[in-house]
């Protein structure tokens, strides 16, 4: 009853006059989807985090839902968290289109921009930043993110730093890369239990047909990028029968040996992200 009295049939104005209205259909659905997560978050924040004795950045992620986050759902979740005493630093909605691991944005750019603008308006009104998850390599939308937020955002990008490491391994230790590549393909189905990707292994050339000099270019192709991306945990944890690591130690020793190469690759890679976001 409290939620119905607070939202149902009500209209809320954002800072620029844009209105958000809750009707019976969309309201009941969003309560069913989000209320348990909201209650759990408020409990964790107030019982564990609030008393930790230091400043924290608190981010709420609602991007793992099956459908994009509507403006009404975004407003409802954030409003309820704030009423529950949660100080939100950033919130990650699920945007339209697909933010798959390791590759560029898939979807209609104009629709994304329209919906992103609305999410930013809500965040500015309620006092936190918008967060973009799986933000690595989403070059098509970076200019929109940088411009619309005026630099106030959180972009999660780390996974493709691993792919730059894989690129260095492919160039400097091709024998190790070949083993990693075959292992990744063999264990792809296990990794796909945790990540949604569109990679098609049949589009990846047979590695035994490639010369060593051709291996680094596999990190420029979407299918092989995604396969090596989502299997990183399996690759690093894999062990031999005697308990030694199958790949991990050699990966680290290779990267230590060619540390400057890896740094240069990261400077170029992250530089592309910063440039796309309008950061100079």
What positions do the PLM features span?
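Catalytic alpha/beta active-site cores
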Residues: 1-31, 47-48
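Active-site capping/gating regions of soluble enzymes
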Residues: 33, 37, 42-52, 66-280
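Short Gly/Ser/Thr- and Asp/Glu-enriched loop/turn motifs at secondary-structure junctions
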Residues: 53-57
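Acidic active-site catalytic centers that drive phospho-/nucleotidyl reactions
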Residues: 63
């Amino acid at each position: 009853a409290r939620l119905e009295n607070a939202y149902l049939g009500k209209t809320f104005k954002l800072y620029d006059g844009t209105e958000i209205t809750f009707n019976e259909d969309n309201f009941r659905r969003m309560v069913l989807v989000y209320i348990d997560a909201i209650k759990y978050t408020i409990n964790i924040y107030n019982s564990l985090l609030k008393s930790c004795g230091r400043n924290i950045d608190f981010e709420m992620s609602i991007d793992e839902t099956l459908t994009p986050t509507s403006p009404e759902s975004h407003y409802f979740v954030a409003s309820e968290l704030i009423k529950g005493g949660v100080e939100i630093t950033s919130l990650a909605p699920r945007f339209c289109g697909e933010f798959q691991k390791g590759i560029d944005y898939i979807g209609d750019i104009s629709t994304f921009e329209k919906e992103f603008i609305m999410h930013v308006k809500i965040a500015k009104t309620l006092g936190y930043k918008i967060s973009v998850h799986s933000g690595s390599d989403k070059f098509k939308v970076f200019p929109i993110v940088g411009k619309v937020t005026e630099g106030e955002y959180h972009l999660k990008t780390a996974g493709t730093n691993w792919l730059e490491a894989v690129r260095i391994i492919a160039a400097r230790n091709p024998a190790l890369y070949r083993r990693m590549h075959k292992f990744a393909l063999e264990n792809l189905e296990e990794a796909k239990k945790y990540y949604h990707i569109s990679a098609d292994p049949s589009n990846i050339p047979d590695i035994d047909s490639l010369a060593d000099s051709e291996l680094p270019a596999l990190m420029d192709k979407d299918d092989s990028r995604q396969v090596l991306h989502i299997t990183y945990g399996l690759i690093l944890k894999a062990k031999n029968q005697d308990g030694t690591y199958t790949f991990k130690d050699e990966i680290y020793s290779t990267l230590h040996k060619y540390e400057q190469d890896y740094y240069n690759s990261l400077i170029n890679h992250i530089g592309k992200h910063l440039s796309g976001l309008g950061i100079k």
